[in-house]
Amino acid sequence: MPDRTAAPSYPFVYLASQSPRRRELLDQLGVRYALLAPTPDEDAEALEAELPGEAPDHYVLRVCVAKAEAARARLVASGKPAAPVLVADTTVTLDGAILGKPADAADALAMLARLAGRTHDVLTALAVIDATGELMPPALSRSAVRFAPATRDALARYVETGEPFGKAGAYAIQGRAAEFVERIDGSHSGIMGLPLFEAAALLRAAHVAF
């Protein structure tokens, strides 16, 4: 195992995500980053497939680590300078079921109808592979979100905005879905997709300077 006490520091991290929210959150921390997006020949969606009977926390951690390993391989193949790689993955769970990204408007509306008037969990996993290629112990942020009761018409109007698409659980807490959020217990940044407390700890352990 590398001696981290003697490791050099790195002025930036590779962010393997296309999420503008995660970029904004890294900006909030003052972390410099370079994007490391999947190449056109990579099947990123295949990594998100659920295994039969898989628990939500196991699922999100497994997917996050798989994405981190794919990103590290992409970095090595690119010949770019060595630096740590950061990956995050978020899922929503209700009654033990995983609510991923909606397939279409009907799917989004069905998800939101399930969440209305209920408390669900938002799980965000973080994985960092350091500059030597070692996977650091992943982190998991768990937050509870309470949705107020909402009419089907109100939910349908929200779906029509297009905001639910590409979002786990079919909503973005930092967007117009805030009108449905009665309360949260946990990490607001984690619900957005990058828990900053855990991210800062992992990045400092990987010797990212910020």
Curated annotation (Swiss-Prot):
<dbReference type="GO" id="GO:0036221">
    <property type="term" value="F:UTP diphosphatase activity"/>
</dbReference>
<feature type="site" description="Important for substrate specificity">
    <location>
        <position position="90"/>
    </location>
</feature>
<dbReference type="GO" id="GO:0009117">
    <property type="term" value="P:nucleotide metabolic process"/>
</dbReference>
<comment type="similarity">
    <text>Belongs to the Maf family. YhdE subfamily.</text>
</comment>
<comment type="function">
    <text>Nucleoside triphosphate pyrophosphatase that hydrolyzes dTTP and UTP. May have a dual role in cell division arrest and in preventing the incorporation of modified nucleotides into cellular nucleic acids.</text>
</comment>
<feature type="site" description="Important for substrate specificity">
    <location>
        <position position="21"/>
    </location>
</feature>
<dbReference type="GO" id="GO:0005737">
    <property type="term" value="C:cytoplasm"/>
</dbReference>
<feature type="active site" description="Proton acceptor">
    <location>
        <position position="89"/>
    </location>
</feature>
<keyword id="KW-0378">Hydrolase</keyword>
<dbReference type="Pfam" id="PF02545">
    <property type="entry name" value="Maf"/>
</dbReference>
<feature type="site" description="Important for substrate specificity">
    <location>
        <position position="174"/>
    </location>
</feature>
<dbReference type="InterPro" id="IPR029001">
    <property type="entry name" value="ITPase-like_fam"/>
</dbReference>
<protein>
    <recommendedName>
        <fullName>dTTP/UTP pyrophosphatase</fullName>
        <ecNumber>3.6.1.9</ecNumber>
    </recommendedName>
</protein>
<dbReference type="GO" id="GO:0036218">
    <property type="term" value="F:dTTP diphosphatase activity"/>
</dbReference>
<keyword id="KW-0963">Cytoplasm</keyword>
<dbReference type="InterPro" id="IPR003697">
    <property type="entry name" value="Maf-like"/>
</dbReference>
<keyword id="KW-0546">Nucleotide metabolism</keyword>
